[in-house]
C-alpha cells in the first residue's frame, strides 16, 4: 500500500476509534517505526492529543533486512482533546516511557502477538475495572484476553477470518468457557461448539 493510501486507511480507523471513545478517552497504538510519520499524523488528525511515545524494549531481536536489527516497538500514547483523560492513582508519576517485557518465544497465533503482561500495563494505567476497552485490530485476541484477566470489558474486531477464528479458539482454550461463545452469521446465532463441528466435518471431507 502506498504511503498516502496507508495514511488515509489509518486516519479512517483512528476516526472510528475516536467516535466510540468517551470524552478524554486514552489510546495506545503499537506500530512499526518505519511508518511512524503516517501513524503520528493520522493519530493527531483524528483528534487525539499525542502525549508521548512509549518504547517496548524486547528481550530479543526481530530478524529482518535492516542494517540494525529491531529490538523495540514504539507505542503512541494520547487521548481525545474533548475532555480530561483518566490516569490511575496507583500509577502515580513514576511510570516511564521504557517498557521492558519479553516478547513471545513463538507466535503461533499471530506474527505480531503481544504478551498479556505488556498490554495489561497501559490498560490498568488508563482505565478502571469494568471499563470498556476497544481494539479495532484484534489480531490474535491478546487485548481481549488481557481484559478478561484485568476485569475489563473488551470490544474487539478482526477482518481476517483466519485470525477471527484464532481469537475464538484462544478465548475458549484460555477461559475453559465455550457456553457463552457464539457467532452471529446472517442473523443466526451459532454456538461455538457447532462451529467446531462444522470445521471438523469439513476437514473429514477433505481427507
List each language-model region with its residue ranges.
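Core catalytic lobe of class I
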Residues: 1-164
Amino acid at each position: 500500500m502506498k504511503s498516502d493510501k496507508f495514511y488515509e486507511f489509518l486516519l479512517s480507523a483512528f476516526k472510528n476509534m475516536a467516535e466510540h471513545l468517551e470524552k478524554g478517552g486514552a489510546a495506545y497504538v503499537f506500530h512499526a517505526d518505519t511508518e511512524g510519520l503516517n501513524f503520528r499524523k493520522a493519530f493527531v488528525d483524528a483528534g487525539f492529543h499525542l502525549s508521548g511515545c512509549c518504547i517496548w524494549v524486547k528481550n530479543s531481536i526481530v530478524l529482518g533486512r535492516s542494517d540494525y536489527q529491531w529490538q523495540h516497538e514504539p507505542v503512541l500514547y494520547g487521548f481525545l482533546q474533548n475532555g480530561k483523560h483518566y490516569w490511575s492513582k496507583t500509577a502515580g508519576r513514576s511510570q516511564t516511557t521504557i517498557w521492558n517485557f519479553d516478547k513471545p518465544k513463538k507466535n503461533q497465533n499471530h506474527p505480531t502477538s503481544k504478551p498479556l503482561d505488556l498490554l495489561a500495563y497501559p490498560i490498568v494505567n488508563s482505565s478502571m475495572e469494568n471499563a470498556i476497552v476497544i481494539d479495532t485490530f484484534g489480531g490474535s485476541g491478546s487485548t481481549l484476553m488481557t481484559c478478561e484477566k484485568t476485569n475489563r470489558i473488551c470490544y474487539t474486531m478482526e477482518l481476517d477470518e483466519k485470525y477471527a477464528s484464532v481469537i475464538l479458539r484462544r478465548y475458549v482454550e484460555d477461559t475453559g468457557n465455550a457456553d457463552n461463545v457464539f457467532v452471529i452469521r446472517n442473523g443466526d446465532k451459532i454456538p461455538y461448539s457447532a462451529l467446531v463441528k462444522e470445521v471438523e466435518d469439513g476437514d473429514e471431507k477433505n481427507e
